[in-house]
Amino acid sequence: MIGLTHYLILASLVFVIGLVGIMRRRNLIMLFFSSEILLNSANIALAAISKYYFDLTGQIIAFFIVAIAASEVAVGLGLLVLWYKKTGSISLDSMTNMKG
């Protein structure tokens, strides 16, 4: 039977994958994807702990995190499209020469 520790180990591994993606990538789209992976690892942990304690609060919070993450991605990708139209690049290095 799959227990709580299995889910928490999975959530930890997914979290580490997201952290490595954030630290290693210079592309802004990949940074967005990596941050979504981090949020999904938190959702896995919340849902697993919620199921373990027979409480729906964690699953409800995970549902709201998914909804907020979807709106975050929509706004973030819109900003990235505008940035690409302005600079022609979506590299993290292209953001260092912003002028106010």
From Swiss-Prot:
<dbReference type="InterPro" id="IPR001133">
    <property type="entry name" value="NADH_UbQ_OxRdtase_chain4L/K"/>
</dbReference>
<keyword id="KW-1278">Translocase</keyword>
<comment type="similarity">
    <text>Belongs to the complex I subunit 4L family.</text>
</comment>
<dbReference type="GO" id="GO:0048038">
    <property type="term" value="F:quinone binding"/>
</dbReference>
<comment type="subunit">
    <text>NDH-1 is composed of 14 different subunits. Subunits NuoA, H, J, K, L, M, N constitute the membrane sector of the complex.</text>
</comment>
<dbReference type="GO" id="GO:0030964">
    <property type="term" value="C:NADH dehydrogenase complex"/>
</dbReference>
<feature type="transmembrane region" description="Helical">
    <location>
        <begin position="2"/>
        <end position="22"/>
    </location>
</feature>
<keyword id="KW-1133">Transmembrane helix</keyword>
<keyword id="KW-0997">Cell inner membrane</keyword>
<feature type="transmembrane region" description="Helical">
    <location>
        <begin position="60"/>
        <end position="80"/>
    </location>
</feature>
<dbReference type="GO" id="GO:0042773">
    <property type="term" value="P:ATP synthesis coupled electron transport"/>
</dbReference>
<dbReference type="GO" id="GO:0005886">
    <property type="term" value="C:plasma membrane"/>
</dbReference>
<protein>
    <recommendedName>
        <fullName>NADH-quinone oxidoreductase subunit K</fullName>
        <ecNumber>7.1.1.-</ecNumber>
    </recommendedName>
</protein>
<keyword id="KW-0520">NAD</keyword>
<dbReference type="Pfam" id="PF00420">
    <property type="entry name" value="Oxidored_q2"/>
</dbReference>
<keyword id="KW-0472">Membrane</keyword>
<dbReference type="GO" id="GO:0050136">
    <property type="term" value="F:NADH:ubiquinone reductase (non-electrogenic) activity"/>
</dbReference>
<keyword id="KW-1003">Cell membrane</keyword>
<keyword id="KW-0830">Ubiquinone</keyword>
<dbReference type="InterPro" id="IPR039428">
    <property type="entry name" value="NUOK/Mnh_C1-like"/>
</dbReference>
<keyword id="KW-0812">Transmembrane</keyword>
<comment type="function">
    <text>NDH-1 shuttles electrons from NADH, via FMN and iron-sulfur (Fe-S) centers, to quinones in the respiratory chain. The immediate electron acceptor for the enzyme in this species is believed to be ubiquinone. Couples the redox reaction to proton translocation (for every two electrons transferred, four hydrogen ions are translocated across the cytoplasmic membrane), and thus conserves the redox energy in a proton gradient.</text>
</comment>
<keyword id="KW-0813">Transport</keyword>
<feature type="transmembrane region" description="Helical">
    <location>
        <begin position="29"/>
        <end position="49"/>
    </location>
</feature>
<keyword id="KW-0874">Quinone</keyword>
